[in-house]
């Protein structure tokens, strides 16, 4: 208390101009002081040292997962880098890949289409892992990296998503993820369904989409674009949801379920 009393006494002795300066200094210190509660995401993120934008962009972050977008241009190699594991990649824009491990070429000009997914184990920097774009167009990726390394017993049962009016194609299934592909043709709706579990929607082909909850519109004809993401987790277990394609182009997205 004595310290605060001295500060107040000194403040009252200041001239009007000096008081304004004092207040400005306090505001700057408050606004730009480091946030002790901010989360350090570096252990979940990739760094491609050869690229102009080596860190890409964090496009989503919550208590379960971090999503990072990276773009590799034609003829570019990412540069030697590590992977944290518990991670999948989704090709928003696919292309031709070549890869090296321990400085040796592992594969060359392998094609990955738009919407294709894969799993990344942990790779230490000592393995000298590197990948390059062997095609003529940029490759755009979104990495989904889990924060929690839970045991099988802690995960419980997680079910595949089903839609009444649309068939979902299972693209990937392991101990941490399901990944399903959804295609909505013009005028097509998913059908009312429960939204259970922890899921992320990642758009591959965009368009105009509408959404309903319990039969009532949440929004109508919202434009979505490739690479858009949405966290899907219902606040009420009894609510039904559905989305519909109200545009003229086919919409495609992948549904990532965290187990």
Residue positions per predicted region:
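Bacterial N-terminal signal peptides
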Residues: 22-31
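Ligand-binding loop in jelly-roll beta-barrel domains
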Residues: 94, 124-147, 234-259
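Short acidic-glycine-tyrosine-enriched beta hairpin
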Residues: 105-122, 217-234
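Surface-exposed beta-loop interaction hotspot
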Residues: 132-136, 140-180
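Glycine- and acidic-residue-biased ligand/ion/polar-headgroup-sensing regions
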Residues: 84-103, 196-215
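Bacterial N-terminal signal peptides that target proteins for export
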Residues: 5-22
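A short glycine-rich, His/Asp/Glu-containing loop-to-beta-strand
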Residues: 53-80, 85-92, 162-192, 197-201
């Amino acid at each position: 208390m004595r310290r605060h009393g001295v500060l107040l006494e000194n403040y009252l002795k200041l001239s009007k101009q000096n008081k304004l300066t004092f207040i400005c200094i306090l505001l700057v210190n408050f606004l730009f002081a480091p946030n002790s509660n901010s989360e350090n995401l570096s252990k979940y993120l990739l760094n491609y040292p050869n690229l102009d934008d080596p860190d890409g962009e964090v496009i989503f972050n919550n208590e379960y997962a971090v999503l990072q977008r990276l773009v590799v241009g034609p003829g570019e190699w990412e540069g030697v880098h590590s992977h944290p594991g518990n991670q999948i990649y989704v090709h928003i824009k696919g292309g031709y890949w070549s890869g090296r491990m321990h400085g040796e070429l592992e594969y060359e000009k392998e094609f990955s289409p738009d919407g294709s997914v894969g799993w990344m184990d942990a790779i230490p920097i000592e393995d000298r892992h590197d990948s390059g774009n062997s095609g003529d167009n940029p490759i755009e990726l979104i990495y989904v990296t889990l924060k929690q390394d839970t045991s099988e017993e802690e995960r419980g049962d997680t079910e595949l998503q089903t839609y009444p009016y649309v068939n979902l194609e299972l693209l990937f299934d392991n101990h941490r993820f399901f990944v399903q592909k959804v295609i909505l043709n013009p005028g097509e709706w998913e059908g009312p369904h429960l939204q259970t579990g922890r899921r992320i929607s990642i758009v591959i082909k965009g368009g105009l989409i509408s959404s309903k909850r319990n039969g009532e519109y949440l929004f109508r004809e919202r434009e979505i674009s490739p690479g858009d993401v949405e966290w899907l987790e219902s606040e009420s277990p009894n609510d039904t949801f559905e989305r519909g394609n109200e545009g003229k182009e086919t919409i495609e997205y992948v549904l990532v379920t965290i187990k």
